[in-house]
Amino acid sequence: MKLDTLANTVGEWLRGTGPESDIVMSSRVRLARNVAQFPFVSRATEQDRADIERFLRERIATSPAGSALEYIDVGGLDDVDRQFLVERQLISRELAEAQGARAVAIDGREQVSLMINEEDHLRIQCMHSGLDLEGVWRQILAVDEAVGKVVPYAYHPRFGYLTACPTNVGTGIRVSVMLHLPALVITRQIDKVFRSLHKISLAVRGLYGEGSQAMGDFYQISNQTTLGKTEEELLQQVGDVVPVLIDYERRAREFLVRETEQNVHDQVSRAFGILRTAQTISAEETMQLLSRVRMGVLLGLIGDVNIADINSLLVRTQPAHLQKLRGVELDTRDRNIERARYLRQHFEGGEPRTNAN
């Protein structure tokens, strides 16, 4: 898989075609697995890691799932290429920043990725556009079963799947949904919502998962622990709360249009104007402005722009993507200039509507 070619494509989860995709960017399920005969990654020697990587590479290739996957040696990539995969949500920051032998296997639609030698020996991830936890679960279950036919997982009859982190012991599952919640941020209700989520043992993280900051009003909601609950119970725990959050966000958007229509229209128009004319712009400012424009498109305030385009720009304007698209490494100053140029070119012809009706 050539990453330069991948930069010009859009993963399925970014297409904005799934259920409730106006607010739910993506649904993801991740399974943590370890190989019975090897020590955990945190206790593994450099040789152990190399042996784990080779073992899993060979076994995955022979599994029923292997033919649909492209194998990438993450340890052999440069910093830009590793960050590129992080920006596409195909690997974690932890895998990108780790040392020693490590890899990822990815399917052509970017729905499935298998990370090798992250916190656990193997982390299987499936991701779909919109709110589709059931579909993601069916897909990842099939991949897990296929790999499990050729890989002896570390499993305890009482405790379940054994993992490096105690919070993952049991099912080893992490269920997460990425939501775009700009209206709750603008109306200052977001902290109240997050406090309620923490009370029911759900975690709130930023765009790139654990330890990352929220950018562009995007948040990941996920379960915190797995022990003592079945996969179905954890899927339901997250699945039950997401429709409530969707309703809160939609009501907040309706309130903004009803009570502060001109102000919202002004915010959206200013954001769109800056994106179309800026000569230099940071990744952080771009994310925030794209967030406002994304909301504006869905409120009918901007024409000739669709959600799939905005979703794509959220990724393609990130530092590594800009460098892959340009074909050269760029320092911060040049990236900001290139980002502005790319946005001007992309939005050429799109016009904000002149009224708030």
Name what the model sees in each region.
Residues 160-177:
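Conserved phosphate/anionic-ligand binding catalytic regions in large, soluble enzymes, centered on
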Residues 177-183:
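Alpha-helical support elements that line or immediately flank enzyme active sites
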Residues 1-158, 173, 187, 192-194, ...:
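Long, Pro/Ser/Thr-rich low-complexity/intrinsically disordered regulatory tracts in eukaryotic proteins
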